[in-house]
Structures are given as C-alpha cells and as structure tokens.
UniProtKB/Swiss-Prot annotation:
Function field: O-methyltransferase that catalyzes the 2 O-methylation steps in the ubiquinone biosynthetic pathway.
Keyword Methyltransferase found: yes
E.C. code: 2.1.1.222, 2.1.1.64
Residues at which S-adenosyl-L-methionine binds: 40, 71, 92, 135
EC class: transferase
Organism: Roseobacter denitrificans (strain ATCC 33942 / OCh 114)
Stated name of the protein: Ubiquinone biosynthesis O-methyltransferase
Length: 248
C-alpha cells in the first residue's frame, strides 16, 4: 500500500522539535501561545457550541463530540477540549511533542489520544471527526491547499473546522517577525517565515477550494497596555481565526 502524501515541511518540524519540552512553561518559548490561549478557547468553544447546539454552562457540553487537534504541540488546546467532555485526538508531526503532551495529560487526570502522525495519514486511515482544530499550522506546511483538503476529509458531513493563522502584510511582519522574534524574543528567530503567511481572503479562497463553506472570521488583537488578547470583528491585520463547515 502506497504511503499517503504529506504536506509536512521537515525544516518547520525541526523548529518545534527543538522546543518540545518547553510547551507548558508559561514564561518560556511558547509564552505567546499561553497568552493567546484564552482568546483562542473563547472563539473555539463559541463556534462549537453554536454549530452543535451545546450549552456551555452544562458540566460537559462537548460530550459525544470527537475533536481532532492537528498540530497539537504539548496539548494547550487538547486538554481544555477534554475537560469539556470531548473525545479528543491530538496529532503532531513533531515526534518529541507527543510524550510531553501525554505526560502532562496523565498528570492532569485527562484521557487524550495523542499520536505522532499527520493530517494526510489520518485521512488515509479513514478517521472522522466532528471538529478539526487547525490552529497556527497552515503557515508551516509545504502546500496549504493539499493540507486543507486533508483536513476536510477528516470531517464528518456537517463538521466544523476552526483554522487560525497570520495575515501577510507589513504590519504582520513588524509585529510577528520583528516584534515577537527579535525585539520581545517571545519566539526563537526563524520560527515564522513571513512569505508563508496567508491573507484572510486567500484563506477563505483556499477553504472553499478544499470543499469547505467559510462561516465566520475574527481577529486576535494584542493590547500592549493590558498585556492581553481580545477578539475583533474588524481587525484581522495580524493574527486571525476562521470557522468553516463541511457541507452535509
């Protein structure tokens, strides 16, 4: 049997392999994601609750939903989804991330199925999910359209994909490359390549080409005064997130 094609970029994976042990250090190399996580979770939970008619005030609102966190890293999103009752699979192409994620989940009393694999491999295996979380991954793959097609194949009809990435414009270069990597040193230099960033309109087009119906998009906006992130319906100039649905 022929192995599935992959959009994994080995040079991108190597960057995150080198940082694997630091995933749960809130002041370490993944500090930006820890800061962004409450905002990401706000958007994700709202979209899932709306799409599947779930009450977020209930004890386990996502019980019965199967969620894939692709590019799961150390489990910063997978763990909250499990706490909300979902059956969670966390997948990452960086092998060293998986034992870090597994140990932390065990220490937290959570059952999460972590796998060293890719979207393409999971699709080839016939895996199906209600929700695919595709957060800060698409700007690191070799072929965004092929990757997004694999993500669509992983969804059940009527399933939801939440995809976040970085806009490509002068402001995002200043904020995400110069600011985050060189000035603030939140991330190691070279973590991102500005040429791989994707504009919101480009991402909407790619989602449609992959067979998805985009239904929403918001910006993640950093406030340097409060040192926190917020969702914005208008400012998609740097970080942004989209929701799309697979036709039933």
């Amino acid at each position: 049997m022929q192995a599935p094609q992959t959009t994994v970029d080995p040079s991108e994976i190597a960057k995150f392999e080198a940082m694997a042990a630091e995933w749960w250090d809130e002041n370490g190399k993944f500090k930006p994601l820890h800061m962004l996580n409450p905002c990401r979770l706000d958007y994700i939970t709202t979209q899932i609750a709306g799409e599947f008619d779930r009450d977020l005030a209930s004890p386990e609102p996502f019980k019965g939903l199967r969620i894939l966190d692709i590019g799961c890293g150390g489990g910063l999103l997978a763990e909250p989804m499990a706490r909300l009752g979902a059956d969670v699979v966390g997948a990452d192409a960086a092998e060293r991330n998986i034992p870090v994620a597994r140990v932390h989940a065990e220490q937290s009393g959570l059952t999460i199925d972590y796998r060293h694999t890719t979207a393409e491999a999971l699709a080839a295996e016939g895996e199906q999910f209600d929700v695919v979380l595709n957060m800060e991954v698409v700007e690191h793959v070799a072929s965004p359209i092929d990757y997004l097609i694999a993500c669509r194949q992983l969804l059940k009809p009527g399933g939801l994909q939440v995809c976040s990435t970085l806009n490509r414009n002068p402001k995002s270069y200043v904020m995400a490359i110069i600011g985050a990597e060189h000035v603030m040193r939140w991330l190691p230099k070279g973590t991102h390549e500005w040429s791989k960033f994707i504009t919101p309109d480009e991402l909407y087009d790619l989602l449609r080409q992959s067979g998805m119906d985009p239904v929403d998009r918001k910006g993640f906006v950093f406030n340097p005064i409060s040192w926190s992130w917020k969702l914005s319906g208008r400012d998609l100039s740097v970080n942004y997130v989209t929701a799309s649905v697979k036709p039933a």
